Every structure is written in structure tokens, then in C-alpha cells.
Regions:
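Bacterial N-terminal signal peptides
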Residues: 2-8
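Generic structural microfeature
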Residues: 7, 51, 92, 143, ...
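Non-catalytic cell-wall polysaccharide-engagement segments
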Residues: 12-15, 37, 44, 104-244
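Export/targeting segments at the very N-terminus of extracytoplasmic proteins
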Residues: 13-90, 142, 146, 159-176
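Structural recognition of the beta-strand scaffold that forms the well-ordered cores
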Residues: 55, 93-96, 188
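Alpha-helical transition-metal enzyme core signature, strongest for iron centers
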Residues: 60-64, 101, 189-193
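Electropositive, surface-exposed helix/loop patches at the edges of structured domains
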Residues: 87-96, 100-104
Length: 244
């Protein structure tokens, strides 16, 4: 009953979305469908549920603007590589990832026990060489797909049920129905994440901002912006595509 009510609320709260940005939604859906197999190959390497991962970044696909992204990629290349995040910190790529977001994520990953088992390590030093390598990864869609996998692994670890010793300490993200995992993971992705340690992240903190409508999308004629709940859009997409 609770899940049915949640899905009904998602539908009611975002029905206007596909009507006002119908073409962008359809274009994003086609793009996701055509890239799904390639994304799945990446996400499965890191034991990340590919349906959840795709839904988490779907709203960014709806908003994506090629020409704006090209300009921002150029700005990040010329500003971030030599000067760090103070030089430039634009979100880039289809998944709209900021260098500062990725720097924090890499550091959290390298503090975890997952880097060695998955054979994935990062140079987190404050050097131009490390920033160049990071930019190269961010400029690649496969690189961004790997970062999303890393993000979700860390999110499910820090906001999961188990502490570092494997003791159950809370009802974590892993215990929720998939559509709710999507809603909360997407909200955290959009709002920013406070990295903790295993089992210590507060889902209530994420829930507190889930309903906030701060994600801007243009209307059909791109004459003005309307603001949406990022988590609700992601959950709606999941319900449409994967939870039929």
C-alpha cells in the first residue's frame, strides 16, 4: 500500500513534466535506451544495479545541452587543470559531474576497503597531473559511468545497514524498495553527499530535501524555467521503464 501511494504521488507531482518538456524527455529516453547495454557492462563490473544507476542520472539527460556542455568542458580544461576547483568547477558531461564532487568521491573511495578488490585506485594528490587524469576521465562517458558506479557503491555503504564491522546498525538504503532507493540516491546525487563511514549516513537527512523543487528544466519553448524535484523525476523514470 505504501509503495503504491508513493508511486501515485510521483505520478501526480511530475505529470506536468513530460507535457512541458516532452521532447527533451523523449530524447533522453531514447539516448538512455541506446546506451543501456554499454552502461550496464560498466556498472555490473562494480556490482551496481544498472536500473537504479540509470534512473539516478536520467534527469541530467533530460536537461543536457550539447553546446553549453562543450563550452563548460573547455572552461574546465583551461581553468581546472592548472588551477584546481578555484580555477573552474563547472558540471560537465552527460551525467553533469563537477570536479570538486569527484575529488571528494575519489578520496572517500580510497579510504574505503573497496579500491583494492575492484582494482580501481585514484591519485588524489593536489597536482596538475592528477587533475589532468581526472579531467580525462570526466570527459569520457565511460569514465563518468565508472564514477557513478563508485558513487553508488559508497552511498550504499555509508548510508547502508551495516557498520564497518558488519553489524546491523540501521535500516539502510539497501533495505528500501528499488523505487525509493532511486528517489533517495538521486536526491543525494543532486544535492550533494556528506561522506561518513559505513552505516553512519542519515537517510532522514536525505528525505528532508527530497521534495524540494530546485532542479531547473526549460518548458517546451525554452522561454523560461520550471523547477522540479530531482528525486521525483528519477523515481518516475524508474517506475515507467523498470517497474512496469
Amino acid at each position: 500500500m505504501a509503495l503504491a501511494l508513493a508511486l501515485a504521488l510521483i505520478s501526480c507531482s511530475t505529470d506536468e513534466g513530460p507535457l512541458t518538456f516532452r521532447q527533451s524527455w523523449k530524447t533522453a529516453s531514447r539516448y538512455a535506451s541506446s546506451h543501456r547495454d554499454a552502461w550496464q557492462q560498466v556498472w555490473q563490473r562494480y556490482d551496481v544495479p544498472s536500473d537504479v544507476a540509470e534512473a539516478v542520472i536520467f534527469p541530467e539527460l533530460v536537461r543536457y545541452n550539447f553546446w553549453q556542455d562543450m563550452a563548460e568542458v573547455s572552461a574546465v580544461e583551461s581553468g581546472y587543470i592548472p588551477g584546481g576547483t578555484e580555477g573552474c568547477d563547472y558540471s560537465i558531461g552527460r551525467f553533469q559531474m563537477k570536479p570538486s564532487f569527484i575529488e571528494d568521491l575519489e578520496k572517500r573511495w580510497m579510504r574505503s576497503d573497496l579500491a583494492e578488490p575492484y582494482g580501481l585506485s585514484y591519485d588524489t594528490s593536489d597536482t596538475q597531473t592528477a587533475r589532468q587524469a581526472r579531467f580525462d576521465r570526466l570527459s569520457s562517458e565511460e569514465g563518468q559511468a565508472v564514477y557513478l558506479a563508485v558513487y553508488l557503491r559508497m552511498l550504499f555503504l555509508d548510508y547502508g545497514s551495516l557498520d564497518r564491522d558488519g553489524n546491523i546498525v540501521q535500516e539502510g538504503l539497501d533495505t528500501l524498495p528499488p523505487v525509493e532507493q532511486v528517489r533517495l540516491a538521486a536526491t543525494a546525487y543532486n544535492h550533494g553527499t556528506l561522506w561518513r563511514s559505513p552505516g553512519t549516513g542519515s537517510l532522514d537527512r536525505i528525505r528532508a530535501v527530497t521534495a524540494e523543487e530546485k532542479f531547473p528544466l526549460p518548458n517546451l519553448f525554452r522561454t523560461r524555467m520550471r523547477y522540479y524535484s530531482y528525486g521525483d523525476l528519477a523515481a518516475r523514470y524508474y517506475a515507467q521503464v523498470f517497474n512496469k
